[in-house]
Amino acid sequence: MTERTFSIIKPDATRRNLTGKINAVIEEAGLRIVAQRRVKLTDAQAKKFYEVHAERPFYGELVAQMTAEPVVVQVLEGDNAVLKYREVMGATNPDNADEGTIRKLFALSIGENSVHGSDSLENAAIEIAQFFKDEDIVG
């Protein structure tokens, strides 16, 4: 079933000019990039996006990291896009990620792991709506 999911190419990757290489991995996996924008997250945007982690000890560091430099927000489309992109990203800890995954190829650490991807269709819809209007998404 064709689905949409949300992706962020994080500051550790944009700082190293890896957007094109990451996009190539995404597209080689059969996902289409149907919307993409480079943005500098505000403190308020990052706090809202990561509010699920507000009580976690790493929350402040996460918000600071995500607002330090530009990110690339994306809408990806394809068969079983949520699950497929999570497989393409690899494990959160790059040491545990499978060969050929984005995190194995590009992540610097568990904290600077290069990409975010939605964990469910419901969250994908919520996350997409935070950054894109319907008319921004061109399938």
UniProtKB/Swiss-Prot annotation:
Alphabetically ordered keywords of this record: ATP-binding, Cytoplasm, Kinase, Magnesium, Metal-binding, Nucleotide metabolism, Nucleotide-binding, Phosphoprotein, Transferase
Residues where ATP binds: K10, F58, R86, T92, R103, N113
Domain of life the protein comes from: Bacteria
Family annotation (Pfam families): NDK (PF00334)
EC number per UniProt: 2.7.4.6
Enzyme class, first EC level, given as a word: transferase
Broad class of the protein's primary localization: cytoplasm
Name of the featured protein: Nucleoside diphosphate kinase
CC annotations in GO: cytoplasm
Entry function: Major role in the synthesis of nucleoside triphosphates other than ATP. The ATP gamma phosphate is transferred to the NDP beta phosphate via a ping-pong mechanism, using a phosphorylated active-site intermediate.
Family matches, as CDD domains: NDPk_I
Self-association state and partner proteins as the record states: Homotetramer.
Iron recorded as keyword: no
Compartments where located: Cytoplasm
Alphabetized InterPro entries for the sequence: NDK-like_dom (IPR034907), NDK-like_dom_sf (IPR036850), Nucleoside_diP_kinase (IPR001564), Nucleoside_diP_kinase_AS (IPR023005)
GO biological process: CTP biosynthetic process; GTP biosynthetic process; UTP biosynthetic process
Family: Belongs to the NDK family.
UniProt cofactor(s): Mg(2+)
Reaction catalysed by this enzyme: a 2'-deoxyribonucleoside 5'-diphosphate + ATP = a 2'-deoxyribonucleoside 5'-triphosphate + ADP; a ribonucleoside 5'-diphosphate + ATP = a ribonucleoside 5'-triphosphate + ADP
